[in-house]
Amino acid sequence: MSEMKNRKHQLRQRRVVRTRAKVSGSAERPRLAVYKSLKHISVQAIDDLVGKTLSAVNDKGLTGKPVERAFEVGKLIAAKLIELKVENVVFDKRHYRYHGQVKSLADGARAGGLKF
């Protein structure tokens, strides 16, 4: 069984590396990086040229179903970035499928005024 787990982990890491090779953020257009655990979802806006996180939001303290919380997280990160005068972002979904919570977070960010 550990060999199968190792193979899945290798495939996941390969997807992450492939995605990161294509996606890079700057101060004008930061990378919106998504992290999803079994209970929570978080997102941070990263300027890769400097290596600095501009803003970060997670769903701790929010109520509702996971997809609804992800939508709210998207709206919150959009509001924080618009305060910083950032409207354009690059969406980095990492190895997660663009479905469910990840899609809902992206939709919330768009609803908040961000452009991908």
Model-derived features with residue positions:
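Ribosome large-subunit tunnel/peptidyl-transferase-proximal elements
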Residues: 2-116
